[in-house]
Amino acid sequence: MKKTYHLCWSGGEEILFRSRRDYIHGIICLYIAAYESGSLLLAYCLMSNHVHICVRTENKKAFIKAFRYSYTRYFNSRYHRKGRIGERNFFSIEICGLYHLLATISYILRNPVHHGVCETPFGYEFSSARAAFKNEMGYALGASPASKKKHHNQIPDRHKLPPHVLMDREGLILPESIIDTADLEHQYSSVRAYQYYMNKISAEEWERRQAEDKNGKPPIRLEDIEKGIKGANMKEMLANMTSRAHHKMIGDMEL
């Protein structure tokens, strides 16, 4: 039986994604791990030194192990190194209840805003924020999808992507082709609710709504999502949600 989890893999003292190519390959590895384990991705966000994932899976350890192993092989080959990259363990929370799920996904997709690398979740390229309600929000498909054959050298050995997976011309997987968007849109129920959660300031109201799940679980808070991330500053992250728009924000790779 599949259960829903928030999983977080931290780089610790290391940078997991040093370049645009690393992010692109990381998303490929993430999806292959989900596809081959029969897991369903609900949300993801790759930051320079950590990864947040919301996934429905029967075996969270097998899923995250496959993802890390595949990406580590790529990373070690690209940067001529050996051994493990990032923290040995990963952080996980089992998600039970609608409002716990909405809070979890919203925190994951808002992560770049919390870290001050973009002004809205929809402005960050290496997350799945723009996968849901694309038509309602007026988003085009994005860059014209390219044939996967053009990017076969980026796909890990012995793996094949199914026909429905689309890439842009750089090989970046389009999130709407790998996220369970039907489930995600059902959970949020409307584009207005989705936008509300993507932009609402983190507050006690979220905790009160989660209590309505009546599952005996404590509310999901920002500090829970960021637990284990080295250097995470809760006050600063919350301040980034309430500050005035930044005309020039530092990018994640620059950071």
Go through each PLM region and give its residues.
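Short beta-strand->loop micro-motif that forms the acidic, two-metal-ion catalytic signature
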Residues: N49-T57
